[in-house]
Amino acid sequence: MKLIVNADDFGYSKGVNLGIVEAHREGVVTSATLMVNMEGFEHAVGLAKEHPTLGVGIHLVLTCGSPVSQDVPSLTDGEGRFRRGQDHLISAVPEEIERELRAQLGRFVAAGLKLTHIDSHHHVHAHPAILPIVLKLAEEYRVPVRYPWLFGTQEKRDQLSILTTEGFSHHFYGDDLTVQSFVRIVEDMADYPVVEIMTHPAYLDEAVLTGSSYAKQRTTELKILTAAELKQYIHDQKIQLVTFSELG
């Protein structure tokens, strides 16, 4: 098995950034996805350049923080910030969605990073109103997309003609995670050639504590992802840790 361990929310804050880099340098995280509209963006870019073995993709955002582009009223509230949740996306103006996603990709590329793949915050890329736009952008940038697990079956995925992993898990998430939680996820997907596991390691800082409902759990993830027991399991099972750059 080839395993991509992706850390979401790179760029959210300095605490998140430092936790992700620690999970890569001392643990099993191979990949991260960058939020270009958040306060820790520039800090994350610097860390990414210092750690070239960390694959970095983009974490497209339509539900957190503020937009990168101008004049996207169908996506924002009265204060100019993205609306919470996803209910508004079905009625959002497609041209505004595409304009914003293109602006985020443009900021990523302008930072001088190599784009490895595309995923999204709160899985909005799998939303029926968003997925066609994301697939068009992925084709333009010639990069893989996180398996759109909300979209349905393997057959449906194959019909989309996208480059992605055969397996994806969002189950490494919650209040009661252990090393065995991670191991069970890997074992459940043992028949897939290439698998991605989504993670959220971080150190706590004010931005996380005040802005995210998923806070202290991130430190638990960091502890697990750097645990000697987990690294030994991956070694013993001859699992190859890779990034999205190895797809194709």
UniProtKB/Swiss-Prot annotation:
The keyword Hydrolase applies. It comes from Brevibacillus brevis (strain 47 / JCM 6285 / NBRC 100599). CDD domains: YdjC_EF3048_like. NCBIfam families: PRK02134.1. Mg(2+) binds at H59, H121. Its cofactor is Mg(2+). Pfam families: YdjC (PF04794). Probably catalyzes the deacetylation of acetylated carbohydrates an important step in the degradation of oligosaccharides. Keywords: Carbohydrate metabolism, Hydrolase, Magnesium, Metal-binding. GO terms for biological process: polysaccharide catabolic process. HAMAP family: COD. This is Carbohydrate deacetylase. Its EC number is 3.5.1.-. Belongs to the YdjC deacetylase family. Signal peptide: none annotated. It is an enzyme of class 3 (hydrolase). One of its GO terms (molecular function) is hydrolase activity, acting on carbon-nitrogen (but not peptide) bonds, in linear amides.
